[in-house]
């Protein structure tokens, strides 16, 4: 009996030890699985967040791209809108000016935006956007600003011919001439050197021209191809050496590389307000002729001083401020409507004549005597052809999360037919074997085209169709 009891006792102890080992194994397995599941959850959550961010980024980018394309369409419709009001100007024996429809792009294109944009569109146009189909954006929006690049001084004139070099030198010196900017050129740069107006002007032109000759921006000597020896080795002597490009600027940021373009110069003459690109006096795109109807007051002052460097508004700070104030007030009264119908109207105004000349004189501004009114007239215009479109696509995800993608596109409307002139079916009709009727016939039936032309011929014809929405010459996504 005793032996049997001992055996039972030993067997119970063995079972107890075995149960303890099993418990440890189960707890260990649970711990390992917990770690694995936690890591798997973290990895899955990260991948899901990454996929969501990528999805939102793509959607935001396409919202911005849509805004760019809508802007191109809006600008392309301006000649048609201008034609509608042409009879009114003909009655007054005047040519209808270009209408700055791009200044109201956020309201006109609001029907394609979010609910808030649709409300702005309805208030502006008087039409309820909700009556349209497939309009508007859900869970997102786009923010849009269209900037007239022909309203600015084009630094890329330095990459053109000698006449363009002289014009750019005059405009740069005119822009920098007012005495309120003296302190900018009295400070040392990061290398301990001074850069006066002449050296900065020469550096900008020499960066873009194709020769190795130092351009002279002295206005008293600007009568031809002005050079004063060979370009120096300033850039090669910098701690991080590089060479002059001797080619056109590709972007505004490239101006940072030019001698004398420090932060003070940049904040005054290149990009005074990073949140408002319309205030930029300088550009690297454009036709080269400044639109006096859309140029900001600072740019207008520089352009006038280019043609009349000895005018009071160019050498007297009080007169400069009077001019800037007068232009700002006139723009405010017209609410964006063009002030001048032609370059000659602007010249007449600045010389104290015309309808606006006496108004500026009433403010105390003295008349301007241009060195050559005919030459000055060649540097200005009242019509713009090159525009920057700054579009931001905003994708909303959840309550607080927003994904933003910015697109900056520069669109050139030079040599672009208007919507009324273009016949998008001419190339297709030619491919169908009816080129003689392409210009005057109504839009051909697509089925007939398919029957009369091969698929290869049609594919070859599509690239030849006229582009009425301008040509994109610069494109950047951020």
Task: Please identify what each model-predicted range represents.
Residues 2-478:
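Compositionally biased linear targeting/interaction segments
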């Amino acid at each position: 009996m005793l032996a049997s009891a001992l055996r039972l006792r030993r067997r119970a102890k063995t079972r107890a030890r075995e149960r303890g080992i099993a418990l440890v194994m189960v707890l260990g397995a649970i711990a390992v699985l917990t770690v694995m599941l936690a890591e798997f959850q973290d990895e899955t959550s990260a991948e899901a967040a990454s996929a969501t961010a990528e999805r939102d980024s793509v959607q935001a980018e396409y919202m911005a791209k849509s805004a760019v394309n809508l802007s191109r369409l809006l600008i392309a419709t301006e000649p048609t809108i201008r034609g509608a009001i042409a009879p009114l100007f003909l009655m007054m024996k005047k040519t209808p000016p270009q209408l700055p429809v791009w200044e109201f792009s956020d309201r006109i294109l609001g029907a394609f935006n979010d609910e808030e944009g649709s409300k702005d569109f309805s208030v502006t146009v008087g039409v309820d956007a909700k009556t349209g189909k497939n309009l508007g954006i859900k869970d997102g929006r786009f923010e849009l600003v269209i900037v007239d690049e022909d309203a600015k001084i084009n630094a890329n004139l330095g990459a053109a011919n000698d006449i363009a070099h002289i014009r750019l030198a005059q405009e740069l010196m005119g822009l920098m001439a007012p005495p309120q900017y003296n302190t900018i050129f009295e400070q040392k740069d990061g290398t301990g050197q001074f850069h006066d107006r002449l050296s900065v002007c020469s550096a900008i032109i020499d960066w873009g021209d194709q020769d190795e000759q130092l351009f002279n921006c002295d206005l008293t000597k600007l009568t031809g191809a002005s050079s004063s020896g060979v370009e120096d080795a300033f850039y090669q002597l910098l701690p991080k050496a590089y060479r002059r490009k001797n080619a056109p600027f590709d972007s505004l940021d490239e101006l940072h590389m030019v001698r004398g373009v420090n932060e003070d110069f940049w904040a005054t003459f290149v990009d005074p307000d990073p949140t408002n690109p319309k205030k930029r006096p300088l550009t690297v795109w454009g036709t080269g002729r400044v639109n006096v109807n859309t140029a900001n007051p600072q740019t207008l002052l520089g352009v006038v001083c280019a043609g009349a460097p000895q005018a009071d508004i160019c050498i007297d700070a009080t007169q400069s401020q009077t001019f800037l104030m007068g232009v700002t007030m006139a723009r405010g009264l017209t609410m964006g409507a063009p002030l001048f119908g032609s370059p000659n109207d602007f010249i007449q105004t600045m010389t104290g004549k015309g309808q606006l000349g006496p108004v500026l004189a009433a403010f105390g501004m003295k008349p301007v005597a241009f060195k050559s009114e005919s030459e000055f007239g060649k540097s200005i215009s009242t019509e713009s052809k090159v525009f920057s479109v700054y579009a931001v696509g905003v994708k909303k995800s959840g309550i607080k999360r927003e994904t933003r993608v910015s697109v900056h596109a520069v669109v050139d409307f030079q040599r672009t037919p208007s919507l009324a002139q273009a016949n998008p079916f001419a190339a297709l009709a030619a491919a169908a074997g009816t080129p003689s009727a392409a210009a005057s016939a109504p839009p051909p039936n697509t089925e007939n085209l398919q029957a009369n032309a091969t698929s290869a011929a049609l594919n070859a014809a599509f690239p030849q169709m006229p582009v009425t929405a301008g040509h994109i010459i610069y494109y950047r996504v951020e």
